[in-house]
Amino acid sequence: MKSSMNPTHRPLLLRVTILALTCAATLVFAAERPHDIVVYGGTSGGVVAAVQAARSGHSVVLISPTQKLGGLTASGLGMTDTAGYRQIIGGLAREFYQRIGKHYGDPSNWHWGDREGYMKKVASGAARDGMMHNFEPHVAEKVFEEWAAESKITIVRGERLDLRQGVIKEGARITALRMESGRTFPGKIFMDASYEGDLLPGAGVAHTLGRESKETYQERFAGVQPRAGVEHQFRYPADPYIKPGDASSGLLPEIHAATPAAMGSEGSADKLIQAYNFRLCLTDVPENRIPIQRPDGYDPARYELLGRYFKAGFAHPFGLHDAMPNRKTDLNNFGPFSVDYLRGNDGYVEGDYATRDRIIAEHIRYQKGLLYFFLTDERVPTEIRQQLAQWGYAKDEFADNGHWPWQIYVREARRMISDYVMTEHHILGPQIAPDSIGLGCYPLDCHNVQRFVNAEGYALVEGGIFASQHSPYPISYRSIVPRRAECENLLVPWSLSASHVAFLSIRMEPVFMVLSQSAATAASLALQNHCPVQDIAYDQLRDQLAKQNQVLDFKPDRPKPQPIALASLDGIVVDDLDVTFTDDWVCRHDGRFVGQSFRSDVSHGKADKTFRYRAILSKPGTYEVRYAYTNIRGAEKSAPITLYTGQGPKVIRIDLTQPPPIDGLWVSLGKFDFATQEATVVVSNAGTTGTVVTDAVQFLPIAP
């Protein structure tokens, strides 16, 4: 049959048809049914929040930008950080780890390795409370998927928030979230469970990125930290220049600042955050191992600094052992040049998805290339190359992603600024949040941020912090809700209101799960009472959390010891951060000490190690010299201390098993005449069998 339509009308009809189809598609997307609670982020916390919301009888939708559930917990982070305080993990977080324990309690789930030996050595706590904190990624993912299915949660996978216009508001309330695809999800209460805090900008909620200055919250670990990168610092001199010794030749790759001053003054604010990486799941089981291969685009030049560091004497790049069941390991950063990609995350948090994808791809190239460098560069000690050659990617993990984890380790991103800000003072004391919704327990743990060249012309790392909190601490409900004027129906359990320093401890996955369950319970109360999330009664929330077996309080056996501020001490004091030393001296915080830390020599076994304090005295003359140390178990009875006064060395031996006699902190080495203004004290562990401990040296002038 011949058409009677005028051909000139066909383009118009085509346009009308396309418009109609587009409108129809929009209507389909707009037809998503409303939910009581909308959770954005398929992370561990996102799943927990959705499960709790469903158990409370509410309709809930969990929107996951990825196809997978569980975030980092299901993507390689198989060694859970609890700092030894298993008892503070309650509620659904405890249930998660007990489900893991139940899985590994079945002998049929052990295919390689010594199950009984592993359980005694690594997972002995499971016999007491049923929890296992070390697990394979696919097992964690299985638990999350089973949880979601049992709770009949509506899950939307592979939908990413429209970063520009995705948060739809009316006044101070969010009404819906719109995805890149156009799909729109209306709801009553919303929760940001993403690692990036992606709802905060669109919701008009105040937030920050980077490190505050020391002055902002009066935090001693805040801001640029050129002296605090003590845990994974360069221990041997590594030349940073393309042509060794020639600064004019330029910096090697992976070095970011030519001088300390280029980073900013100590304690100043910046927009940088700790490094990201992928937590790799490796195995040494031949039949389950995929060998590490040369990656596409491999460039050994980007690892030249690492090669020079090995040549200088470095010999401990990582610790490979079967820390997870079935002879697998969770490979994390170890040392100043390792799997952490320093400054690789610049631009990630506030970038669009194309930028993020590019940065993620570069992290993969960096880490794959690094492993290949470890295997093949002749400067890497033979025993290390041979050790790594026994390991490879686990064949039964991440099979749909090239056996590579699908979630990059976003250790830190946006942080909300609300009416209550968690700070260093909540973690280290003396402040205590009165409206606890869960406990944190991990030390302040900041991975390195950047590398720089020191005044002597050698490479160092900056930003690394590891400071013990001594005991668990409460986290405030007000820290997970925005200011009322900004948004009345949003809860933020991950990108919560915390300083950079406080977040270093709070950021652990078990805590994320705990806070997310508490957030979902708060959302339930806000729905029941028809009120903003800021107005729920804390007593009512606390009662509900107690019924869910959440742990909200912890009474330590003894008060937290407070560090002694350098500014409070008389005379000239040289702290452990102001020294040069050989090999690794462990940075510690478990006791009373001067400044930010103290050190002990036990790390990679007994070896001759020295710790050298240098002081510039106000003038030559007589000084009393005092030595600070923390009294610990297993200390050395005769630690050799050598004092250089300009008149020859003087060796003094100290019994470190005895409590320090002066203020419980110091022992006097004696009174000495110094011929010049230069004074040196060298601590050694040569010939010792106990642990050598050192903290600070004090020079007190004696009046003539």
PLM regions and their residue ranges:
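Extracytoplasmic
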Residues: 562-704
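N-terminal Rossmann-fold NAD(P) dinucleotide-binding loop
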Residues: 46
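Boundary at the C-terminal end of the N-terminal hydrophobic targeting segment
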Residues: 28-30
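Conserved N-terminal/central alpha/beta ligand/cofactor-binding core
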Residues: 58-59, 64-166, 208, 216-218
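Beta1/beta-strand and adjacent pyrophosphate-binding region of the FAD-binding site
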Residues: 33-43
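Bacterial N-terminal signal peptides
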Residues: 15-26
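Flavin (FAD/FMN)-binding glycine-rich loop and adjacent Rossmann-like elements that form
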Residues: 115, 141, 175-176, 183-189, ...
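N-terminal secretory signal peptides that target proteins for export/translocation
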Residues: 1-12
